[in-house]
Regions:
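Short beta-strand and adjoining strand-loop segment in the mid-core
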Residues: 63-88, 124-132
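Short glycine-rich or small-residue beta-strand-to-loop segments that form or flank ligand, phosphate
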Residues: 24-29, 125-126, 209
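Short, acidic/small-residue loops that bind anionic groups at enzyme active sites
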Residues: 47-56, 81
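Rossmann-like NAD(P)-binding element
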Residues: 1-38, 42-48, 61-74
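NAD(P)-dependent Rossmann-like dehydrogenase/reductase catalytic/cofactor-binding core
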Residues: 78, 85, 92-125, 135-275
Length: 275
């Protein structure tokens, strides 16, 4: 299966009529790992096996191969090894980690049995949380570069506007497609996500076909919940998730309330949009 997390249980219920003892269900989508644990327990009395596979690679996976993070019983995962080996990218042209040649396992091939039921989707969950943070960092950094010409703009002079000190320090008209491209070439922050960013900026520097309403499919939220349960600080991942909420207007009421309080205590009027 590779279906949205919200319909996995219904899909399993439909499939049960066609399954026999010893059959294996593979969930290759982005289910919540806690649901994986429950499903494996529910299916065990029927002698059905459940394997959770966190799959990364996006639409490019068909060409590049899929990175897979796997959770399930040892014997079952070993039985499926040839399937995972076929779908995985293999070592390819990625340089080996020094010392890795002495380590047995499949991780270099692009797939890994992470642990018992739920472990595969747990690792993929955190992978996606990290993805949120990396994407946010690129977006914020390039946003700062895009506004590096703010010193050339006309600025309102009133009590509601923070003055720009030293506007002569911000008079750079920077070409973001070229900057993203040069970063791809030997920089510390080079990555596949940066490759995709460079391609998008080259095609349309203004990103005119996007409204900037960024969805979240659940993995970021689950990652933050896990960080709270584990008492592990994750401020970058948390902020990246919260920013996605804000991008969809989820903070509009709070912002209106801030404006209302400023008006009540100081008579401050909201400035029109774009001012």
């Amino acid at each position: 299966m590779m279906v949205p997390a919200a319909v996995v249980d219904n899909t399993i219920a439909d499939l049960l009529h066609h399954l026999e003892a010893g059959d294996i269900l593979i969930d290759g989508g982005n289910s919540y790992y806690i649901d994986d644990i429950r499903r494996a327990k529910d299916l065990a009395p029927k002698k059905l096996h459940y394997v959770d596979v966190g799959t990364s690679g996006g639409v490019w996976g068909l060409e590049r191969g899929y990175c897979m993070m796997i959770g399930g019983e040892d014997t079952v995962v070993k039985y499926l090894d040839s399937i995972f080996a076929t779908l995985a990218p293999g070592i390819g042209n990625i340089a080996r980690t020094p010392g890795r040649e002495k380590v047995a396992g499949t991780s270099e091939q692009g797939y890994l049995h992470c642990g018992p039921n739920g472990a595969g989707h747990f690792v993929k969950m955190v992978h996606n949380g990290i993805e949120y943070g990396i994407m946010a960092a690129y977006a914020e950094g390039l946003g700062i570069l895009r506004s590096a010409n703010v010193g050339n703009r006309k600025h309102e002079i009133d009590a509601e506007t923070t003055p720009l000190r030293d506007p002569e320090h911000y008079k750079y008209d920077l070409k973001l497609p070229d900057i993203a491209e040069v970063w791809r070439r030997g920089s510390v922050i080079a990555s596949w996500l940066l490759d995709l960013t460079a391609a998008a900026l080259l095609e349309d520097p203004a990103l005119s076909k996007f409204a900037g309403r960024v969805s979240d499919s659940g993995e970021g939220r689950w990652t933050i919940k896990a960080s709270i349960d584990e008492a592990v600080p994750a401020p970058v991942l948390t902020t990246a998730l919260q920013e996605r909420f804000s991008s969809r207007g989820e903070g509009d009421f709070q912002n209106k309330l801030l404006s209302a309080m400023r008006y009540e205590f100081g008579g401050h009027l909201e400035k029109p949009a774009g001012k």
